[in-house]
Amino acid sequence: MAQQNKNQPKAKTGLARCLELASGHKGLVFLSGFLAALAAICSFVPYLSIYYIIREILFVYPDMSLLNVSTISTWGWLALVGILGNIVFYFFALLCSHIAAFGTLYELKVAFADHIMHIPLGYHLTLSSGKLRKIMDENIESVEKFIAHQLPDFVASLVAPLVLVIILLGIDWRYGVV
């Protein structure tokens, strides 16, 4: 008996289990992660633009008549594009993740209802209807929060520090090393 347990694959939990449940919508989940990563990259564009605007001002200080207004304007517009890109990419990341989450919830609820139909009637008599309702409503619904919200945020939180290090290395390698 102990030998049988060693040969069985270990049950997946956490992130791996949620991704396994959403495997029918794998394309949407990965697209959501990709768009969340792009949103994280765009979120740094305004800060980078501010850095270059300040740098431009400091190069000409104290003679502000030498200030290149078109360069500052370009960096300002780029900051605006970065903000809009962040909003748009994050919106579509959440849209994709919500479609995947609701599709997964539908499949889980249908599978649960099908499973309940095949259980002997005597089993249903020993359980309260509230227990089955709790499984259907609360437990299955908890998967939605992870797939729809936490997964895109998780990807963005992994990408953001990498982007920050790349930006710091690009500005001055000593910042990136520190």
Predicted regions and their residues:
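Helix-boundary and loop/linker segments of multi-pass membrane transporters
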Residues: 7, 18-25, 65-71, 138-139, ...
